[in-house]
Design a protein with these regions (language model features):
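Edge-of-domain interaction segments
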Residues: 1-116, 120-160
């Protein structure tokens, strides 16, 4: 007998193996609290910290943005912790970091290390998925991805 699979839907996108797909947790923060700054003009947040004598100060923490909605950003959970307070730029308003969400994606390795990229799945079967290409925070044609997401950790150097 021969197994035959008929695909009746026509989806255009990037074909990736299901073994490369991973779900990752992020902090969700309001857009008003994210700013550009630091030495490299990258995105980040102003985190409230305390000096040894108990004085409150604010430090710029650079963070990657992995997705956005109309009012919020999904930011990396490596630099912030639950319970941290972030301060709105040019204001004294504070926001407690606690809201979390997850995104489906793959580990992108164009720069030599595993970097999470969100994907939008258009079609999926047991072996592979068709994902939307050229999205703002996602994959493009000719991007290198990790084939088995269970074998790497975020920001791990990848040796060919």
């Amino acid at each position: 007998f021969i197994d035959v699979e008929l695909i009746l839907e026509d989806e255009a996108g990037l074909k990736i193996p299901n073994s490369s797909i991973v779900e990752k947790e992020f902090f969700i923060v309001p857009k008003d609290y994210v700013t550009k700054g630091g030495n490299s003009n990258n995105f980040g947040v102003m985190r409230e910290t305390y000096t040894e004598d108990g004085t409150a100060t604010v430090e710029f923490i650079e963070t990657n943005i992995y997705n956005e909605t109309d009012e919020e950003y999904y930011v990396d959970d490596m630099t912030l912790r639950i319970g941290d307070y972030i301060v709105k730029p040019e204001s004294t308003e504070k926001y407690p970091v606690s809201k979390r969400g997850s995104l489906i994606g793959v580990y992108h390795m164009n720069k030599g290390y595993a970097d999470f990229k969100q994907i939008n799945i258009l079609y999926q079967n047991e072996e592979y998925s068709i994902v939307k290409s050229n999205t703002q925070y996602g994959l493009s044609v000719y991007d290198y991805i990790v084939l088995d997401a269970t074998t790497v950790n975020e920001d791990e150097l990848i040796y060919e």
